Amino acid sequence: PPAAKAIIVLGSGVINGQPSPTLANRLDRAAPVVLAQPNAKLVLTGGVDFAETESEAAVMSRYLQQRYNIPTAQIILEDQSTSTELNLQNSQALLSAQQISTQQPIVIITSDFHTLRAAAIAKKQGYNQVSMLGATTPLGTRYNAWLREYFAYGSGWLLNEYWLGNSPNQAQRSLAM
């Protein structure tokens, strides 16, 4: 990926205080990118799951620090969100506080099955220079993940989560027809 001002890793579940296999793959995909770009801010996204006491973002941070020695000064925790849309929306304010705008180069790391929908949401929210990187989905969850994402993409289209054209209102007009 090109030199980035920020790298955003989207959450994907925590199990007993540890990253889920899908989330661990995202973090393992992110680590070399982060290490190669020490001046880029790293935003780790995800709030507290109903069955957990610690946010996904905090678990992600601990994993990257322990396994890859990612410096805490590079990490920003977005620990309030519960969806892709909120991950990216909340990250904007945190990046803005660091004088980083959505007009600057940003890398978003998620799972391979999730890149299309995440890119569409990012575009609608004004992220204009995004590079998407997809981590491999663990074989045991791959088919369920792809099926779930298929329906999530359709649902997002109906809920107008994506920017489908040259103007933000075009998506609303196409839904009204």
Kindly label every feature range from the protein language model.
Residues 1-147:
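A structural signal for short, hydrophobic/glycine-enriched beta-strand patches
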Residues 50-56, 152-159, 175-176:
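A general structural signal for short secondary-structure boundary/capping elements
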Residues 142-166:
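A transmembrane-helix-recognition feature enriched in membrane-embedded lipid enzymes
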Residues 164-177:
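Short linear elements at protein peripheries
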